[in-house]
Amino acid sequence: ACTSQQAPKLKEGEKPVDVAAVVRQKMPASVKDREAWAQAIAKTFDSQKLAPTEENVCSVLAVAQQESNYQADPAVPGLNKIAWQEIDRRAEKMHIPVFLVHTALKITSPNGKSYSERLDNVKTEKQLSAIFDDFIGMVPMGQKLFGSLNPVHTGGPMQVSIAFAQQHTDGYPWKMDGTVRQEVFSLRGGLWFGTYHLLNYPANYSVPLYRFADFNAGWYASRNAAFQNAVVKATGVKLALDGDLIRYDSDEPGTTELAVRRLAG
């Protein structure tokens, strides 16, 4: 491997802080369960062996504020319409009459309400994920529309990718009662996996801004974009500074690789 998977350590001259104390100090007093946040983030830093600096703690809080306004299960405006549109889109893609799907959704779900009723009143991604889990697991139509893939891809207070969480469970300090997906929607799980994605990889960035960009675009996207910029200057070839050095949808070389080949002659 080109890099170790060790998290960044304390820089020279940096002083370790009491993570829980910094969380209590920096979070707005209006936030519910500040103590639960403080304990979850402190345990996250300890179990992932992250450098306990004010900058790192504040970086986690900044992402949580940006993504959820410090809510473990944030409400998403218009989520019910989004959910219905996704179901109708899948039905049309599979050439299943929409009215048949809507009829199937009128049956009673495991919580006693119909799937339609739950979808009409859904407010959060956690609720929507649970509806799809039930629908896929209980109703043949659900398997036909979605296979085994729940279409809710992110969750929790930091809106971390569920696929990312499923690939990075080593060292998780709490006992999981359910699935990794369900754990992401908990306060502790959302913070643990979100912090892992934000901080738990070595990157010699000068400012936290680049880690924030990586959080949205993928690990090392900022570094890769800087490399692309250097290639542009060296070759004069225009490239999208998107951080994607290779094509993931094809064996064909991407634009960045083709530009680098020009440098090599």
Range-by-range predicted roles:
Residues C2-G265:
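Cell-wall glycan-active module
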